[in-house]
């Protein structure tokens, strides 16, 4: 069971934070149709309970996959989900963030380190990608030569936005729009 809701609702503050981070990390993998292994769920629970640290969780996941000889395509996807989830969990509980292009590429590198050789690199080629959430249609992505400027523009627009002038619904709407636009500018390779 992947539901960490019990920790989020009833847990001590540290367990709540870790539970929320794991649930978010695993949920982000689900957006791409990826499912974590039962081993990751067990490891996440140990981390939440304080039985192991995030460093130990990361090492356990790494060792788990190093011990596997051959991988089917499904196992490769599970490996991606487990490794990225562990990396995202670590990032979400850190108290730092650089709202810059360098900061975003650093996040990409840290999430996909050990999964993709191009982790943290801005793509230098044009892409199309069939999205299951769009029933197989593709998003129109920004052309590779224009990516850096497009992302820098988006970040600058976001920096200038005054969050104090919108209510909660306006805030959610604004963030959703920013994420949507940023996604269509997708700076980094993902597959």
Residue ranges and their predicted role:
Residues 184-190:
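Conserved small/polar residues in nucleotide/adenosyl-binding loops
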Residues 111-155:
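A glycine-rich, hydrophobic loop/mini-helix early in the fold
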Residues 1-124:
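N-terminal structured helix/loop subdomain that forms the ligand-binding/catalytic interface
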Residues 137-182:
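Helix-hairpin-helix/helix-loop-helix acidic hairpins
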């Amino acid at each position: 069971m992947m539901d960490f809701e019990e920790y989020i609702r009833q847990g001590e503050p540290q367990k709540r934070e870790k539970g929320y981070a794991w649930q978010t990390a695993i949920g982000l993998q689900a957006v791409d149709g990826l499912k974590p292994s039962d081993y990751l769920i067990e490891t996440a629970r140990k981390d939440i309970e304080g039985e192991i640290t995030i460093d130990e969780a990361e090492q356990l996941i790494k060792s788990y996959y190093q011990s596997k000889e051959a991988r089917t395509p499904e196992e490769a996807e599970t490996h991606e989900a487990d490794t990225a989830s562990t990396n995202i969990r670590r990032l979400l509980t850190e108290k730092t963030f650089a709202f810059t292009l360098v900061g975003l590429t650093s996040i990409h590198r840290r999430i996909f380190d050990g999964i993709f050789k191009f982790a943290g690199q801005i793509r230098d080629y044009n892409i199309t990608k069939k999205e299951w959430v769009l029933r197989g249609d593709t998003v129109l992505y920004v052309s590779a030569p224009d990516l850096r400027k497009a992302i820098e523009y988006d970040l600058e627009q976001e920096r200038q936005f005054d969050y104090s002038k919108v209510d909660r619904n306006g805030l959610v709407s604004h963030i959703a729009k920013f994420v949507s636009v940023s996604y269509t500018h997708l700076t980094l390779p993902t597959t």
